[in-house]
A protein has these predicted regions:
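Generic recognition of short, well-ordered alpha-helical segments
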Residues: 15-19, 46, 66
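Thioredoxin-like thiol-disulfide oxidoreductase module
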Residues: 30-50, 55
Length: 88
């Protein structure tokens, strides 16, 4: 699974998004990318119209920061479910 978190430099809530990204990066099987839309040459995807925006496998799952612990638990549960499905 791939989680992309879109931020900007001037976003007041994006520091929390970076913290969430750092913690999510420790989840086995999850690739996490923080995309700073202020970086030179960075394109803004059509589905991103606010920051922070969380995109999981190409699908927007949160506009704004989700509640951290619940969000991370949900990611772990989804990965565990996918792992179980593959094992069948």
């Amino acid at each position: 699974m791939h989680l992309e978190i879109y931020i900007t430099d001037q976003c007041a809530n994006c520091q929390e998004a970076v913290v969430i990204a750092e913690q999510a990066g420790g989840i086995v099987g999850l690739e996490v990318t923080v995309v700073n839309l202020d970086a030179p040459g960075q394109r803004v995807p059509a589905q991103v119209f606010a920051v922070p925006t969380y995109v999981l496998n190409g699908m927007v799952i949160s506009l704004g920061n989700p509640e951290r612990d619940g969000f991370l638990a949900g990611l772990r549960a989804e990965l565990a479910h996918r792992s179980e499905e593959r094992a069948k």
